[in-house]
């Protein structure tokens, strides 16, 4: 699987509880633009509406060669999941504090676009600082271990 884009802000701003891999109903020009890496997941999120999940505010830049048949960069895109997964996600989102955020866009082995969405809970400012401190100390410990093993 080839990862095209990641939502680094999601890993920083949210605590990821569970992730799902979803297909996406895209136009041909959108798939070609994604293949070129012209996609941004910043500020994008997913929402459950009428038994379907939609990806909102995901920016896919227009494909140069598509001229008049090009797509709208910020249109809402339907995500494809099993009904039971959609129901499960819908129930979790109704609980207070949960959000659905895209974390990765990738191509699977068959060349299909897949979007990894995650059920997340927002982090407070002090939690973000704690995570950064822990990451730094872990990195220092690993560097020290590596240094001593030489």
Language model features with spans:
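Broad gene-expression machinery/nucleic-acid interaction feature
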Residues: 21, 41-43, 55, 76, ...
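C-terminal low-complexity, charged extensions that often adopt amphipathic alpha-helices
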Residues: 99-102, 142-150
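Arg/Lys-rich, often Gly-containing low-complexity segments of ribosomal proteins
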Residues: 7-10, 38-39, 65-77, 82-84, ...
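Beta-rich strand-turn-strand
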Residues: 82-118, 122-124
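Ribosome-associated translation termination/rescue signal centered on the conserved GGQ peptidyl-tRNA hydrolysis loop
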Residues: 33, 40-50, 54-83, 88
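A positional/architectural concept
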Residues: 2-52
């Amino acid at each position: 699987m080839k990862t095209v884009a990641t939502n680094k802000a999601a890993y920083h701003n949210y605590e990821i509880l569970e992730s799902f891999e979803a297909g996406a109903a895209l136009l041909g020009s959108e798939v070609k633009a994604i293949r070129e890496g012209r996609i941004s997941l910043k500020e994008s999120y997913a929402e459950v509406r009428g038994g379907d999940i939609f990806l909102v505010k995901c920016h896919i830049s227009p494909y140069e060669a598509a001229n008049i048949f090009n797509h709208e960069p910020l249109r809402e895109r339907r995500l494809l999941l099993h009904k039971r997964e959609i129901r499960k996600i819908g129930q979790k989102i109704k609980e207070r504090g949960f959000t659905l955020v895209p974390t990765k866009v990738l191509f699977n082995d068959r060349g299909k676009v897949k979007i990894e969405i995650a059920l997340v809970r927002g982090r407070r400012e002090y939690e973000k600082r704690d995570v950064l401190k822990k990451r730094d100390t872990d990195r220092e410990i690993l560097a020290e271990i590596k240094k001593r093993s030489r």
